[in-house]
Amino acid sequence: MHKEQDKKRLATLTLAALGVVYGDIGTSPLYSIKEVFGGAHHPVPITPDNVLGILSLFFWSLIIVVTLKYVSFIMRANNRGEGGIIALMTLAMHKGVAGSWQQKMLVLLGLFGAALFYGDGIITPAISVLSAVEGLEILTPAFKPYILPITLITLIGLFIFQRRGTASVGALFGPVMVIWFAVIAVLGAAAIVENPAVLAAVNPVHAFHFLTGNSLLGFFALGAVVLCITGGEALYADMGHFGAKPIQYAWLGYVLPALLLNYFGQGALLLADPSSVENPFYLLAPEWGRYPLVALATVATVIASQAVISGAFSITQQAIQLGYTPRLEIQHTSDEEIGQIYLPAINWMMLIAIIALVIEFGSSSNLAAAYGIAVTGTMLITNILAIAVAVRLWNWSPARAMLGALPFICIDLGFFLANSVKIADGGWFPLAFGLAVFILLTTWKRGRELLGLRLAADAMQLKSFVVDIAGSGIGRVPGTAIFMTPDPELVPHAMLHSLKHYKALHEQVVVMSVKVFDVPYVPDVDRVEVHRLSNNFSQVVVQYGFKDDPDIPAALALCGEAGLAIEPMDTSFFLGRETLIPKLGSEMAYWRELLFVAMFRNAGSATAFFKIPSNRVVELGSQVVL
C-alpha cells in the first residue's frame, strides 16, 4: 500500500517538475541550432562534417554538464533538500572559520553567482518568448512587423499576472510540457528517419574533429553550443520543490531523449535542406502543423519564463533572510504552497529590464549574443563551491575534490571563454546587470555590519543592565513590552529611549532578536529559545531558516510552551528607527555609504516583514553616524 502511494507521489512530483524545472532547457531547441549555423556572429558553414561535429558537441554537453555534473554530482550537495547557488554557498561555509579569507571568498563567489542568476533571468523570458513568436515569420513574412508587439504584450501580460500567483494554472504546466516534449521528440524522430546518418554524432570523435579542424571557428561555435545547456542549473535550483528523484527521473526518462531527438532531427533537416537554417525548429513541422506549433511554443516559453521569475522571487527571499538584501514586500499567492510568493519590486524591475532588452536587441539571434556568459559564469562558481562542500562536508581530500571537478571546470571554462568574446555584442548586459546586483548585495551586507558596530559601541550589556534596574526602583506599568534588537546580549537602543522618555518599564519586558540559520527551514520545536533573566525580564531568540516565512505573533504563541506566557492584547512592540548619516573616511567608500543610506531608507518596514500588528508598534528614532 505504501509502495503504491510512494509511486503515485513520485509520478505526481515528476509531472509537476516537468512544468517548472525543464521550461528553460526544454525550449532551447527553438534557437540553439539556428544560432550555431545561422547566427549573426560566427555562423558555422553547413557541411556534413560540421553538422555531425556540432550535434556531437550538443550530445556530450547535455551528457557531461547536465547529466553527469548536475544530476549525478551537484545534486548530492543539497542543504537539507534545498538546492541553488545560495543554498550551496551556505553549505560550503559549514565548518569554516568565521571571518577568514576563505569564508569571505565563498560569500563573494556565492553572491556573484546569485547576481549572475538575475542577469540570466532577465534574458531567458526575452529570448524564449521572442524565439517562439518569431515562428510566425516562417508562416508568412506579413507577420514580421507584429513579432515585437506580440512578444511585448505576452511578456507584459505574464508579469501583470504574477500578483495572482500560479496556483490556479500551475497544475496545467506539467501536462503542457509533457505535450511539448512529445511533439518536439516526434518532429525530430521523423527527420532522423529520413536521414539516420546523423546518429553517428553520438561518437565524440566528431566533436573532437570539429574543434581541432576548425580552430578559431570551433572556439567561437562553443559560444552558441552552450545555449543547449542553459537552464541546466534549474535542475539543482528547484530540488527543494520536488526532491532529487522526480527531477532525475524526468530528465533521464523523458526530457533528455526528447531534446536529443529534436536536435538530431534539426541536424538531419539541415543536411537535407541547408536553406532551412532560417528556422530549423519550425521547418521540422509540416506546413499544416506550424500554426499550432507556434501556439504551443509560445505557451511553453511562457511556462519557462514563469519558472525563472519564480526562481528570482525565491532567491531574493533567501537573500533577505540571510541579510544580503533590504526587506522587501513579500506576498503569498497560495494558502497551501508556502513557496509560492510574489515580490512586487523584483517583478516590476525584471519587466522593465526585459522590455528594454526586447526593444534594444529586437531578435532572438541578437539576444543569443547576450545569453550564455551569465549561465557559464554561474556554472563555474557552482564548481568551486561544490569543491568546498566536498572537502568540508564529505571529507574528501582537496586533491580528490579538485581532480573530480577538473573535467567540469575545463568544459565550463571553455564555454565561458567562448562567450566572453561576445561581450561587446551583448554579453555586457547580463554582466553589467549582475555586477549592479552584486554591488547592491555586498553594500547592504557591509552597511548592516557597520551599523551593527556603531550601535554596539554605545550599547550596554543586557545582563548587567537587568541587575542594575532591579535595585533602581524604576516604576512599572501594566502589560508586556517587546523590544526588537539584532543582538540579544545588548540593551536595545529603543529600550533606553523609552526609559529616558517615560521613566518607567512594563511589568514584563522581553528582549527579542531574530536569528537566521544557514539551513532552509527550522522546525517549530526549535523556533524559540527563552531565557529568564529575572522575574520580569526575558530574553527570546526566534530562529528561522533562510526559506522560512518570519511570523513573530506565531513565534510568541510558541513561547508559552517554553514557560513565557504573553497576552497579545496587552503587548506593545518597541522598534528602533535609525536615521543614518554618511561620513567621509569611514570603513566603507563614501559612494557606497550613500547607496546604503538610500537602500536603508527604502527598505520595507520590520512591522510588515515580521507580521507584527501595526497598532501594537511604537517606533523610537535615533541618529547614527556611519
Swiss-Prot record:
Which reactions are catalysed by this chain? K(+)(in) + H(+)(in) = K(+)(out) + H(+)(out)
Which GO MF term does the entry hold, naming one?
symporter activity
Q: Which Pfam families match?
A: K_trans, K_trans_C
Cellular component GO terms, alphabetical: plasma membrane
Q: Does the keyword Ribosomal protein apply?
A: no
The signal peptide stretch is none
Give the way it sits in the membrane. Answer: Multi-pass membrane protein
Q: Where in the cell is it found?
A: Cell inner membrane
Transmembrane ranges, per UniProt, are: 10-30, 51-71, 107-127, 141-161, 173-193, 216-236, 251-271, 293-313, 341-361, 371-391, 401-421, 423-443
Question: Could you tell me which InterPro entries the record lists for this protein?
Answer: K+_transporter, K_trans_C, K_trans_N, Kup
Disulfide-bonded cysteine pairs: these are none
| Entry keyword annotation includes Nucleotide-binding | no
Keyword vocabulary terms for this entry = Cell inner membrane, Cell membrane, Ion transport, Membrane, Potassium, Potassium transport, Symport, Transmembrane, Transmembrane helix, Transport
Similarity comment: Belongs to the HAK/KUP transporter (TC 2.A.72) family.
Q: What does this protein do?
A: Transport of potassium into the cell. Likely operates as a K(+):H(+) symporter.
Question: Which protein, by its recorded name, is this?
Answer: Probable potassium transport system protein Kup 3
Q: Which organism is it from?
A: Dechloromonas aromatica (strain RCB)
